[in-house]
Amino acid sequence: MFKMIFLILSLYSYANANSYKDMFEKDIEIKKVDKIYASTPTILYSLYAIDKSKIAGLNFPFNKVEAIYIDETIKSLPIIGGWFGKGNTPNSEMILKINPDVILLSETSKNQSEKRIRDSLGNINIPFFYIKANSIEDIINSFSYLGKLTSNEKRAKELENYAKKVLDEAKELSKKVKEKPRVYYAQGNNGLETECDKSIRSELITLASGDNVHKCQNSNTYGKELINFEKVLSYNPEIILVYEKEFYKKVYSDPKWQFIDAVKNKKVYFLPKGPFSWFDRPPSFMKILGLKWLLNILHSNSYEIDINKDAKEFYSLFLGLELSNIELNHIMGKDIE
């Protein structure tokens, strides 16, 4: 009965709707855009940067690292879940309860089955707006769509211009790089989970003109390819990028890792995170800053920047945060070096 009443009211409310185009150039009719449900973390974070006042609910509770930097009003929003990761689905009753004006869905959701998603919601007439957010370029391009949807086109353009400038700098530098440094992306508490060079999860290595040593096609969409130490030793990377603090804390003291050039030469780097990772898991607009950071690490002679200054400017622009040196050091893992 509740779903039937909701459907009747929804049909009535869209009689005088405004027209928008999603990232697949599909026309979407929406009467108003006051409450938006973003069904994946990547899209949610971009919406947060452009207009957090429109967020209607969260995909999951923010963890301790994230919560420090997130607006209090957002942290108190209902947890709805979403369509992302390893088969996650949202609470459909909660979606009906918050009654969003539009649902933002990922390219992955579109590929899997719009009908299945509609069926799970009882075929209610909430508009679906599809966002491409797999790559850093997708994320940057999504800003203009989110800007128009939220009537914040000026802010969206400002963020887009900043991001495209960083991407252009990376592309220009790539033309001058003669030899790409060998890079290993270490995940897991033992550092023996990684990503293939073809994976979108390691795209910053490629964009920063690095050579991801693990050449393969991912065996699944989630990633985290298992690898043994002997394989890492055979790769002998010049640079190691570390996701977990647990591994970063012990890599320099673990005897077997001392045979690898990156460890010998103190070229192991913790991947900054706060509120979200600068590199991946989950991917977000923070990768824009991560690209600047990685360019500076891999090509410090040709890409000279003050990363502390640039990071503070980025946090101020994208998140409205004025970071202290102590906060930035914590984000960048300098407190565990």
Model-derived features: where do they sit?
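Classical Sec-dependent N-terminal signal peptides that target proteins to the secretory pathway
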Residues: 1-17
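A short, structured surface patch at a secondary-structure boundary
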Residues: 43-97, 102-109, 210-213
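Bacterial Sec-exported substrate-binding components of ABC uptake systems
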Residues: 14-46, 153-186, 297, 302-337
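Ligand-binding pocket segment of bilobal, Venus flytrap-like solute-binding proteins
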Residues: 204, 214-215, 222-247
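Extracytoplasmic ligand-binding site segments that recognize negatively charged/polar headgroups
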Residues: 65-66, 86-87, 107-116, 131-145, ...
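Structured C-terminal subdomain patch of bacterial secreted/periplasmic proteins
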Residues: 135-148, 248-337
